[in-house]
């Protein structure tokens, strides 16, 4: 099963192995924390690499959940149109980027460039009667703004803390599609050799009625296609 089917993987063991690998790679770069990484304390390069948390990644540099974190004001995010955003962050294939809010994206799309009015607006001024039909809002363009993607971002921010507190058993990491909405099947992480429970949801994450035979993902696909 792919990375999107997280319940088939021993998630906690994988996270700890990734953390150990990230720590070794950070320490191997001492002094100076390695290329593309800045130290918290520029006055003591060796001390900056004494621990994994002592190094910061600059904007545009690779990052992940358990490797040196991004510098203040930056956030580790998957690349645009990344098919498996969780996997990318776990294996350190994210990028340090400046956090973008919904208002910022909306402002960019709503303001015309150079102060020029849009052709549709000019047509309305010439022919007011032709603008009677309401304009339908365009679908979500940025997958990061989907409900599942917002949920995933909040989980990733808390993931490292929960693992070290021992509270990550049965962890639920939302399974998102490319547009940031929920995939049909959602599952909790595996617990030892036992697979975590799964359930079916709609694109907004609302649980769907349980099928009588409870056949997991096949039933989710069949129900959505019917």
Swiss-Prot record:
Residues 26-99 form the IGFBP N-terminal domain. GO terms for molecular function: fibronectin binding; identical protein binding; insulin-like growth factor I binding; insulin-like growth factor II binding. Disulfide bonds join 30-33, 49-55, 63-76, 70-96, 148-176, 187-198, 200-220. The keyword Glycoprotein applies. This is Insulin-like growth factor-binding protein 6. It comes from Rattus norvegicus. The gene is Igfbp6. One of its GO terms (biological process) is regulation of insulin-like growth factor receptor signaling pathway. CDD domains: TY. Residues 101-126 have a biased composition (Basic and acidic residues).
């Amino acid at each position: 099963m792919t990375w999107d089917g997280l319940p088939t993987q021993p998630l906690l063991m994988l996270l700890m192995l990734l953390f150990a690998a990230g720590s070794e790679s950070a320490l191997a770069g001492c002094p100076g924390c390695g290329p593309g990484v800045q130290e918290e304390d520029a006055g003591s390069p060796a001390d900056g690499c004494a621990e994994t948390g002592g190094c910061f990644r600059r904007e545009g540099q690779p990052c992940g959940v358990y490797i040196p974190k991004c510098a203040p004001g930056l956030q580790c995010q998957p690349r645009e149109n990344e098919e498996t955003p969780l996997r990318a962050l776990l294996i350190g294939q994210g990028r340090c980027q400046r956090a973008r809010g919904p208002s910022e994206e909306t402002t960019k799309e709503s303001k015309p460039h150079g102060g020029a009015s849009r052709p549709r607006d000019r047509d309305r001024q010439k022919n007011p009667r032709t603008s009677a039909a309401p304009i339908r809002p365009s679908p979500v363009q940025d997958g990061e703004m989907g409900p599942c993607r917002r949920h995933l971002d909040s989980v990733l921010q808390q993931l490292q803390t929960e693992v070290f507190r021992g509270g990550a058993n049965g962890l639920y990491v939302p399974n998102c599609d490319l547009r940031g909405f929920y995939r049909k099947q959602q599952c909790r992480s595996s617990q030892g050799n036992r697979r975590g429970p799964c359930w079916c949801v709609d694109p907004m994450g609302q649980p769907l009625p349980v099928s009588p035979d409870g056949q997991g993902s096949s039933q989710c696909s069949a129900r959505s296609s019917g």
